[in-house]
Structure formats: C-alpha cells, structure tokens
Amino acid sequence: MMIEIGTTKYVIYAKVIVDGYVEKHDIIGAIFGQTEGLLGSDLDLRDLQKSGRIGRIDVELENINGKSYAKLIFPSSLDRVETAIIAATIETLDRVGPCIATIKVLNIEDIRIKKRQYITDRAKELLKSIVDTTIDTYEIAEEIKEFVRSEEIIEMGNEKLPSGPNVEDSDTIIIVEGRADVLNLLRCGIKNAIAVGGTSIPESIIELSKKKTTTIFTDGDRGGELILKEAIQTCDIDYVARAPKGREVEELTKKEVVKYLRSKIPIEQYIQFHSNKCNELLKKSKEYRSNTINNNNDSGKISIDSIISENATNDIGELPVSKTSKNERNNTKVIDENIEKNNQNIKEDNNIEIKQSDISEILKKDCSEQWEYIESLLNDISNTDNIKIITNDNIIKTIHYSELDKIDKSDIQMVMSDMPITQKITDLFHECSPIIIGRDINITKKPAKLKVFSHDMLKNMVCL
C-alpha cells in the first residue's frame, strides 16, 4: 500500500482481528469512537486528523470463515512521544460493532530515515553521473598539447618527411623510423627529429647528415636493425641510440627517451663493439660517401651485411655504455684517418716505458702464465661494460665503466677492459701511471707516464 509522505514523520503499523464479519468503515468508526475524550482535546484523533497532524487511516481488510483480519496504517506528523501515545491508545480498542476485537501495533516507522536513505542513494547516482561526464583538466590540457604537437610536425624535402620544427635550424638532428616516433619525441620536448618513413633512407636525410651532427634512434627490433645498417652505409652518422629489445621509440616514456639518447655512442665505437672488421667498414663507408658525392651514383655502395656479421658479439640492440662529449667525438673522427699511425706510436712508446718485470710484479705470475691469467680475467668481463682493476695492494676488483671517474685512481696499478680504450679513459688517468689494457686503442694523444696496450700488443709482448 502506497501512502503520501508529505509532512509525515512517522507511520504506525497495526493489525486487527475481529471475531465476526465487519467492513472497513466499522473498524475506522470504532477507533474514533472508542478513543474520543480518552486523551483530552490535544490528542483527540478527530481534531488531529482535521488539523492534518494525523493522516488518512488506510485499512486492508480480509473476511475469512466468518472472521475479519485487517492491517492499519496511521501516518503521523506528531513528534515521537505523541506518536507513541497515539499508538498505545489504538491498542485499547476491544470491540468493533457487536463483535469482539483485538488490535496490536506492529511497528512505528521513522519516515525521515527512509528519506535520508533515499537522499544518500540518489546523491550517489547523481554524483556518479557527474563524474562520468566530467572531463578532467589534465585530459583537456593533454588534448590541447597533442593538437599543438601534431601541428608542429612539418614536412621536409621532396619526400615530405615528417619532422620536428627545428630540424632545419638545429646543428644536430635525430633520425627515427616513422611519424609516430617524431610525435613522441615532440611530446618529450625534442623538436629536431626527422623520420625515415620506410625501410630505405631518403636522399633528404643523406644530405642533412653531411651537414649536421646526426644521431640515429631506432626501434629495438629487426626493422630497426635493418634501417640502422642502411643508415651506417649511406649516411654520415655520428651517434647511435636504440630502444630496448622488443620496444619501439613511439611507446617510450619521456624519461626513457632521455635515458637512451643520453646513452648514445659514437658510430666508430658502435661498429667496433659489433665487429672485428670495424676499420674495414669505416674505410669502405667513407669511400662510399666520397664516391656518392663525386660521382652521384651507386658505384661505391657496399653491403653492410658483409661487414657486420649477423652473429656479432651480442644482439645488435645492446649498446656499450658511453657518455662521450662533443670534443671526444671530434677526436674520434681524427682516429679514422690516423689510427694505424697512432697505434704504432703508442706501441713504440710502451715498449720503451714498460718492462716485462712490471707485469710480473703486478700479476705475481711467471712469464709463461701471464697471458693465460690476463685472458681469464678478460673473459670474466667479456661482452660487458665492466672493467677489472688491480690496486696497489694487488687486490682485483670489478667495477662498471661508468664508475671509473669516481674511484681513487692513485691506488690503481692496472686497468683491464674488453672495450676499446678511448681518449676519455686515458684522460681520467693523466696524473697516474697505471697499465691500461683494452681490446683496441682509439686515442689521439697519450700522457707521457701512461702505459696503454691492446690485447694483441700485450699478448705478443708477454709471450716473447
């Protein structure tokens, strides 16, 4: 049964059993008749109903086997004390007409609790609808930024390559694979990226690489490897950066983009890391670029696959750690032209400055055992960025390449590495005189007291 809530505060529920057949109006008449004058004029049911403080009394009646059963509903706008008094008064009813009757109050319901519950539930629904339809301020800002970034992408060259707005004016460029990569770098605030837009290197990028310092930043998959190989072959690449294996540049976060670009390495060091034929590659690559410029044809084109083996040292996505400065980059270019001469000069210097006994004293090994011992130490750090050092107390330590500038260099007798010895490493030890051993020697000048050896040079000397 539905009741009008209106100003109702409480609802009294009661049941009536009458020993005889009666109608609804008989029950209502008995209630008003038997309670009249019982509580005085203040709580008289007729007066309360006239004033609206007691609502319309609803009766649900059933007549079964000569008896009458009814449910009563009393809406009340009185306070809880007066409502309780009215409920108790109703229970004094003992007859309906000529029939014996009993009445029992079942419950007094506080309507305000239901109202509060309704308010709570409805407020939740309304709030949820507001939250679902509200656009977050961050989303608005990102949407606007995304639009601006997409507007910032320009088209360069006859091939209309997607690129950042600063490619023409910047001294450096970053070559990436596709438009999405350029867009992601724009999100990171990098505006000098240009996309290849396919698996072959466009002529516009080849020309740009001749004029600007060029970094190639490729995905960590097979496609990125192929583009990198062709770029090394056709462009004047200065640095190499790669996304982690199985990742793409377009999905990297800003922190990751900055991290991998900072970890870029010079092209010479990259090729040396992945092939023992690095000098041949550099020479042929340089000849190719020279022939392309002079003859404007493909007669000088070489196959990069024939120079960098598919099974080179590690996966091609793995790069040695390097934080090479611009000055060191310039020095590395000089090595291309003078590496054989420098290696010869360094070899002659070292033969004068170091004796067989120096190595024996450090390693505590006989001449016949020295190279095997050195080789075992080098095998421990093979294909890693780690370095072995031997202190003045003949303690052997393994450290990461990046920690070299943090250690006490005056306490070092020998440094062993599976990587090429660069100018940066020798500069770190310019005030000391340890023996430095590396796979190759890529330096243009050496401090007078420093003893620098490649693996082959040392092997030949200790095995004499």
From Swiss-Prot:
Binds two Mg(2+) per subunit. Its cofactor is Mg(2+). Its EC number is 2.7.7.101. HAMAP family: DNA_primase_DnaG_arc (MF_00007). The lineage of its organism: Archaea, Methanobacteriati, Methanobacteriota, Methanomada group, Methanococci. One of its GO terms (molecular function) is metal ion binding. Residues 171-245 form the Toprim domain. Belongs to the archaeal DnaG primase family. It catalyses: ssDNA + n NTP = ssDNA/pppN(pN)n-1 hybrid + (n-1) diphosphate. RNA polymerase that catalyzes the synthesis of short RNA molecules used as primers for DNA polymerase during DNA replication. Gene3D superfamilies: 3.40.1360.10. NCBIfam families: PRK04031.1-1. This is DNA primase DnaG. SMART domains: TOPRIM (SM00493). Mg(2+) 2 binds at D219, D221. Mg(2+) 1 binds at E177, D219. GO terms for biological process: DNA replication, synthesis of primer. Keywords: DNA replication, DNA-directed RNA polymerase, Magnesium, Metal-binding, Nucleotidyltransferase, Primosome, Transcription, Transferase. One of its GO terms (cellular component) is DNA-directed RNA polymerase complex. Forms a ternary complex with MCM helicase and DNA.
